[in-house]
Amino acid sequence: MSYPVGRKMSIDKSTPRNQDPNFKLLLLHPKYLPTWLGMGFIYLCKFLPYKVIIFLGTLLGYLLHGVSPHRKQIAKANMQLCFPDKSEEEIDDLVKGHFKNMGIGVFEIAIAWWSSKRTIENLKLSSKNVNIFKELDEDQGVLILIKHSTHVELDIRLMAQEIELGGMYKPQSNEVMNYLMIKARNRYVTGAINNHQAKEAIKWINNGQKFLYAADQDYGEKNSLFISFFGVDAATVTFPERLSKSGVKIVMANVSRNKERFDLEFHEISDFKEEGSVLKEVNEFYEKFILHSPENFLWTHRRFKSRPLGEESIYSEWKSRDKRRSKKRQSRE
């Protein structure tokens, strides 16, 4: 895909509008009953003290750790690559901590999606370098890069409390989850679009919008460069670098959780000219953010799925599944 950057778009200067999801009868299909019941329970958790949410999430995390052997293998393989100096026992402890925080993140959705503005304001939040946006021209677009954390939904809500921003989301395969996610995010995110609308994102950024994007996952080799990530070559999407070369400011954002406290920080990426230099700094910031709280990064994603020519797959146990998916895609084309 080529991105039309490098020039101002002649588009409407008004703030982009969110598209409210339509409630369809399909959402009432019996197959979605477990989803409605589960999310209904999580909704009720918004009335609970945060300590209780952490307790319930911890229990769920331990359950997920016990019933998710494949995801556990992926997390362990990623951590072994990124932390070669850690012993197997230390890696296992990190994996357990990661699943614990994933469970907490599920219950934190109640706060992120359905809590009032006052509840969010009452959370213990420390912000650093928020003034970075006031120093920019009013019409200057900003791409804000975040990481996929176990509490990413709450991260987005906390950032939206500080600055007005748009963002990109990946449509969920579960129709009910997709409906609830978009409906909730539309309350606090301006201009939410899906990951198949990259051109719309560029228009909004070139129009002076602040836009959230996560560049810490493997999106395939087509629009990526192999850049070091914890000393391992990782397919890193070139979207931020393309925008940087067009004059768009790139800002790294991170939210870290320490018990019941949240720390939010922003850092501006330098303007580089050499190919890959922006992506190198982006990954270095991601490494720094992850090291601050390693158990909260989304290790269950196959970050090193794409490999340089000649390298063996790191996730050998997923080879057969990938082949099946590839055949299905080819049959649909």
Stretches with model-predicted labels:
Residues 88, 191, 275-276:
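Flexible, glycine- and charge-enriched loops at secondary-structure boundaries
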Residues 3-146, 179-183, 327-333:
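Membrane-anchoring hydrophobic helices of lipid-metabolizing enzymes
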